[in-house]
Amino acid sequence: MHKLLVPVDGSDNAMRALEYAIRLAKACGPTEPVILYVHEPPIVYGELAIYLPEEKLKELQRKHGEDILRPYIETAKRAGVTFTSQVLIGDIPKSIVSCAETLGCSGIVMGTRGMSAIGNLVAGSVATKVIHLTKFPVTLVK
């Protein structure tokens, strides 16, 4: 079965990317979308690092990721496709590429711009970095 990695971030473009991946999965036979949310760890300075243990911080990040994934999971369920989902914590572009490599994905389908896109004309900074870091085909959905 082919796997298509679909990184999401809560944006409309990410939802359109998932919808496109679902259409591909239905049209091309056994293809499984893998819905991925990557939570970039915050930079914590001073006393906050003392009061918020690392495990508690990771738990909060995973919970936030699950909340972000919920509408995407519901969309995939309604479409009736086989899919998986996961939350990773780390550098967003590097985590996307690493996940695609680990899972042996056939490609990456992602939105052109996400929630934090500012100023890039064609593609957001995450999409641009993923394109430069990966060996996999990347489809950008606007």
Predicted regions and their residues:
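Glycine-rich, Arg-bearing micro-motifs that act as flexible, cationic patches
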Residues: 110-132
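Short, flexible loop segments at boundaries between secondary-structure elements
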Residues: 133-142
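A short acidic, glycine-rich active-site loop
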Residues: 53-67
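Small/aliphatic-rich secondary-structure junction motif
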Residues: 2-52
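Conserved beta-strand positions in the Rossmann-like core of class I SAM-dependent methyltransferases
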Residues: 34, 84, 139
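Structural beta-alpha unit
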Residues: 74-108
